[in-house]
Curated annotation (Swiss-Prot):
Belongs to the tRNA pseudouridine synthase TruA family. GO terms for molecular function: RNA binding; tRNA pseudouridine(38-40) synthase activity. Its EC number is 5.4.99.12. Substrate binds at residue 109. It comes from Staphylococcus epidermidis (strain ATCC 35984 / DSM 28319 / BCRC 17069 / CCUG 31568 / BM 3577 / RP62A). This is tRNA pseudouridine synthase A. HAMAP family: TruA.
């Protein structure tokens, strides 16, 4: 039996989602609970592998089980054993051919920035502070330049291992908030550190150090040295996982370009 689990977590105290040889991870927390329940190791398979310090409003993973347990009981048992910074939102059965990683056709991230005269210690780890004056309109113009299908070699970590760095962005915008702005980006998939590099670049645009019309040339050059900065992980949230083409079509229209992950390397 294959079980799909929807979760949320605050990433401050995690080294990321994926299990590490040492250190606290989200995967470790769940596999420890499942091992206790099954009396043997059970591997979980996530839709996304968030990095150290990155949060998730919505994340999914699946696992296979021989235990005949009601979905509400799965949810109750896991939440009872989990620490306060992870919560199981929903549990349901899925087809045995469903795969959290390969059936994921899109993701949405939100990066939160607050501004002011000084840092707010109560926002530490959950939002990024920028005290310089920023031009949000100019930043949004630059953000729009990333929409579409592009090679993002110049906007990801040089440690990115996947061969194809072509991704499609359906949404890329700056949204003004009461204390700053959010950068909201939805795409077919994202490369290692890609969202954080995009945010750092957009902040440079807001400061007047870069221009929106720099984007096409930077994409064409595919040179990370031309976009050297990376924003911290604190303000980054995995906001939504799209597990079916219908979800993307509903939000972005019937002409949306769907990438099926069984034929696309993904992070």
């Amino acid at each position: 039996m294959r079980i799909l689990v929807e979760i949320a977590y605050q990433g401050n105290q995690f080294l990321g989602f994926q299990i590490q040889q040492q250190g606290r991870t989200v995967q470790q927390q769940f596999e420890k609970i499942l091992k206790r329940m099954h009396k043997h190791h059970v591997r979980i398979h996530p839709s996304s592998r968030t990095d150290r310090g990155v949060h998730a409003y919505q994340q999914f993973f699946h696992f296979d089980t021989e235990l005949n347990i009601d979905n509400k009981q799965w949810q109750y048992a896991m939440n009872r054993a989990l620490p306060d910074d992870i919560y199981v939102k929903n549990v349901r059965n899925v087809d045995e051919y469903f795969h959290c990683r390969y059936d994921c056709v899109g993701k949405r991230y939100r990066y939160k920035v607050y501004q002011g005269n000084h840092r707010n210690p109560f926002k530490s780890g959950t939002e990024t502070f920028v005290n310089e004056t920023l031009d949000y309109d100019k930043m949004n113009k630059a953000a729009q330049e990333f929409i579409g299908t592009h090679d993002f070699t110049g906007f990801c970590s040089q440690k990115t291992e996947v061969e194809s760095k072509v991704r499609t962005l359906y949404q890329s915008e700056i949204v003004a908030t009461k204390e700053g702005f959010d950068y909201v980006v939805t795409g077919s998939g994202f490369l290692y550190n890609m969202v954080r590099v995009l945010v750092a670049f957009l902040i440079e645009v807001g400061k007047g150090k870069r221009e929106p019309n720099d984007v096409p040339k930077l994409l064409e050059d595919k040179n990370r040295n031309n976009v050297p900065l990376t924003a911290p992980p604190d303000g980054l949230y995995l906001e939504k996982i799209y597990l079916s083409p219908e979800e993307l079509i509903q939000e972005y229209g019937k002409d949306v370009k769907i990438h099926y992950k069984k034929s696309l390397e993904k992070h």
